[in-house]
Amino acid sequence: MKLFDVYPLFDVNIVKGKGCHVWDDKGQEYLDLYGGHAVISIGHAHPHYVETISKQVATLGFYSNSVINKLQQEVADRLGAISGYDDYQLFLINSGAEANENALKLASFYNGRTRVISFAKAFHGRTSLAVEVTNNPKIIAPINDNGHVTYLPLNDTEALKAELAKGDVCAVIIEGIQGVGGIQLPSTEFMKAIRQACDETNTVMILDEIQSGYGRSGKFFAHQYNDVRPDMITVAKGIGNGFPMAGVLISPKFTPVYGQLGTTFGGNHLACAAAIAVLDVMKAENLVENAAKVGTHLLDELKGFKGIKEVRGRGLMIGMEFEEPIKELRQKLLFEEKVFTGVSGTNVIRLLPPLCLSMNEADEFLTRLHRLIK
């Protein structure tokens, strides 16, 4: 059987990782400034993470959500404490798309409406509702194009107010920082306008923190820079450091009903062990603070590079926009300088390294980049 060929692949076979470095099958070492699409939060093969999930899988890897799993409550308690959302409820699933899918579904259960506001360049996933609120017609199949979504320009407060004033909007879904859209930041004024308009119209505010959350921005959630509290927050990627896991943080105003939401694998014992290990390391090694410190250093230094048109971001979620397409530059970074980076569109390179990136590793990246664009 052949693999279904949907991924354009680099000719690199990564077989080992440690911290912010990975190695291919020829023994070549690379500096990982992408973390597998922002997934690696505490670093590759962290000893505590390896030990925790190894012990768990040797004891019990999985049983269904028909029995008590005390690890789920431990994840909820720990996540609530570190994030500042200890009064919220947690629903555990497997992926970011699934998190957004369930958040939108719950919002519609709540107010009975079907129209959703999303934003230009938004990305929220590839499943039914999640892809419909993603502003990319190329990945929306006809069966997903159901007319539920109105796309608005990011940071256009007047357009937002006008749409919500119609009284038929189920939810507004917005990323804490747009990732696939090129590291675009919503303004504090705009975020507060969303919160106020949602309150006035019984509309649900959903914050997609799948890429921007879990400490990546230098705060636990990127929206905490904007001083708002959404009705739901979706998380994935960094929550499991590579183990498939996701969650929806849900306001107390939502009352759960048996059977309303469900999942086979979500919140399984092994996934919870991975999530607990991640939270252990984040706290012990002050990784949120490290993301803020090292990220600020990178942002400040990159803004001094003459070849870069604009640098955007917060913490270790950084976009570098160039005047010219960056395909060749990204390939040179990988194959000549041995650095993994990401991309957005044709002109933006994204940096999404593990949160344990050191100052020395950041400076090493700057040196390698400078050799290519000096």
Pin down the residues of each PLM region.
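Conserved N-terminal phosphate-binding loop of PLP-dependent enzymes in the Aspartate aminotransferase
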Residues: 1-374
